[in-house]
C-alpha cells in the first residue's frame, strides 16, 4: 500500500494538459496593458521605495494667504450687534488675558468666538486648497 502512495501519478486532464491559456478579451475592455508596480520602477524616487509621491502635501502659500484674507474680510463685517466676529474674538482674548494665570471659564464667550472663528478659517483654507489645486491640476 505504501508503494501506491509513493509512485507519482497524474490526474487525467491535469498532468499533461495541452490547453493553452488565452488572455481574456472583450469589446467592453480596453486593450490589455501590463500593470506596473510603481514601487519597482527603476529610479522612480531616487532608488528609494515610497508609497506616496514626495510632494503629497502640494503646499502652496498662495492658498494660505488668499484663504486668510478670504476669511478675515467677511469675518470683519460688523454683523453681530454692530461688532464683527474677528473683533469679538480678539476682544475676548484681551479680557481673558487680563486674568492670565486663571484659564477662561467654560461659560465664557471666548470659547464660542474661538470655535466659530477657527471653524470658518479652516473651512475657508480647505475649500481654497481644493479650488486652487483643482484649478491648477485641471480638475475643473
From Swiss-Prot:
PANTHER family: PHOTOSYSTEM I SUBUNIT O. GO terms for biological process: photosynthesis, light harvesting in photosystem I; photosynthetic electron transport chain. It comes from Arabidopsis thaliana (Mouse-ear cress). Component of the photosystem I (PSI) complex. Interacts directly with PSAL. It holds the Pfam family PsaO_TMD. Residues 82-109 are lumenal, thylakoid. NCBIfam families: psaOeuk. One of its GO terms (cellular component) is chloroplast. The chain crosses the membrane at residues 61-81, 110-130. Involved in the balancing of excitation energy between the two photosystems I (PSI) and II (PSII). This is Photosystem I subunit O. Residues 1-51 form a transit peptide. GO terms for molecular function: mRNA binding. Belongs to the PSAO family. The lineage of its organism: Eukaryota, Viridiplantae, Streptophyta, Embryophyta, Tracheophyta.
